[in-house]
């Protein structure tokens, strides 16, 4: 397995915060009020933005399971198995997302981002760094992933930014449209769209892939990207950015991830074509292709054995899997019109030394 975003969106009845429910910042439930940005009065229970003991310009007090020094775990990893969709809070070796050495410079000050799959893994790390750089953040995940999303909420609000959680099923086109509208309604606008949520389930042969499985993978990984982008177009202004999570598998393939690899390749082609179409509008479209990343996606993959998980990332030149905090800065670069104003239509590879030509 290579690219690790998040498991796919699923339908759940009685979602506590459906996309079409208007929960304004003024009426949010106690303890869930959006926090204020730099220069505004924030929640009194949150740390002052851009302060962190021992780390200048790093603000949130790390969770107990987050390391305070730069030390990426290496194989062998714990042999464990998670039930779908896979919760980060249940992993014995927690993915690292805090990026304690990352120094923010206000690259995204005043911007608003919508991040799918922002409850954990790469999506959580991206949401946290976006907030650290000054952006307000809305994330999308399934109701089953809400326990992880609450940690993302805590981390984003501790950075002094506003946060919106949207729960539902990204395979539903209407829900995708509602996600965009709710982000704009509650945060005022949309500057950065990150299509990151994904579903994968390894199969050792083509014959094992059912039609239902094939459609679920495509609906979650590429169809949702199309629906979200189409809905976002009326809100995106010159200087806005669209970023999608592809994968090493989308570039080199995988014998056990035929459907997943096909969607990740489609993401690359769609993004490159989108970049050409939107260039004259001043809107940039790019994608990131991570290699193996330590997230809940793999222990929740029914086709990934605990023994294989223990060796995860060992075949990369760097001999290990990445941590989400190592991947997220690429998303900051691609979102910042100060850093990447002349960058569109690229695939930014983060694959631990593996090259594709």
Range-by-range predicted roles:
Residues 146, 167-180, 211, 325:
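The beta1-alpha1 cofactor-binding region of Rossmann-like NAD(H)/NADP(H)-dependent oxidoreductases
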Residues 256-257, 280, 292-316, 357:
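A glycine/serine/threonine-rich, flexible loop-to-helix segment
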Residues 247:
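Residue(s) in the substrate-gating loop at a strand-loop-helix junction
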Residues 234-235, 276-280:
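Alpha-helical segment proximal to the catalytic Tyr-Lys
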């Amino acid at each position: 397995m290579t690219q690790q975003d998040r498991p796919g969106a699923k339908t759940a009845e009685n979602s506590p915060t459906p996309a079409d429910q208007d929960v304004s910042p003024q009426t949010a439930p106690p303890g869930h009020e959006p926090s204020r940005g730099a220069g505004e009065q924030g929640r009194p229970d949150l740390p002052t933005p851009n302060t962190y003991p021992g780390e200048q310009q790093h603000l949130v007090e790390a969770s107990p399971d987050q390391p305070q020094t730069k030390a990426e775990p290496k194989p062998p990893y714990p042999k464990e198995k998670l039930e779908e969709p896979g919760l980060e809070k249940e992993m014995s070796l927690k993915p690292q997302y805090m990026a304690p050495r990352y120094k923010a410079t206000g690259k995204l000050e005043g911007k608003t981002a919508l991040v799918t799959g922002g409850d954990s893994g790469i999506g959580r790390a991206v949401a946290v760094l976006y907030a650290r750089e000054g952006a307000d953040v809305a994330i999308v995940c399934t109701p089953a992933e809400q326990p992880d999303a609450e940690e993302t909420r805590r981390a984003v609000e501790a950075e002094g930014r506003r946060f919106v959680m949207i729960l539902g099923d990204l395979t539903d086109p209407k829900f995708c449209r509602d996600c965009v509208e709710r982000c704009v309604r509650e945060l005022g606008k949309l500057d950065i769209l990150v299509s990151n949520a994904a579903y994968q389930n390894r199969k050792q042969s083509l014959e094992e892939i059912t039609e239902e499985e094939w459609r679920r993978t495509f609906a979650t990984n590429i169809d949702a990207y199309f629906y979200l982008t189409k809905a976002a177009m009326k809100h995106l202004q010159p200087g806005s950015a669209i970023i999608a999570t592809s994968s090493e598998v989308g570039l080199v393939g995988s014998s056990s991830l035929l459907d997943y690899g096909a969607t990740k390749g489609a993401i690359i082609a769609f993004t490159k074509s989108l970049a050409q179409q939107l260039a004259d509008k001043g809107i940039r479209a790019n994608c990131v292709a991570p290699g193996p990343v330590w997230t809940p996606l793999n222990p929740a993959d029914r086709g990934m054995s605990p023994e294989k998980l223990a060796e995860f990332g060992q075949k990369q030149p760097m001999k290990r899997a990445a941590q989400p905090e190592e991947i997220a800065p690429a998303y900051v670069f691609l979102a910042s019109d100060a850093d990447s104003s002349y960058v569109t239509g690229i695939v930014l590879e983060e694959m631990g030394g593996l090259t594709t030509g």
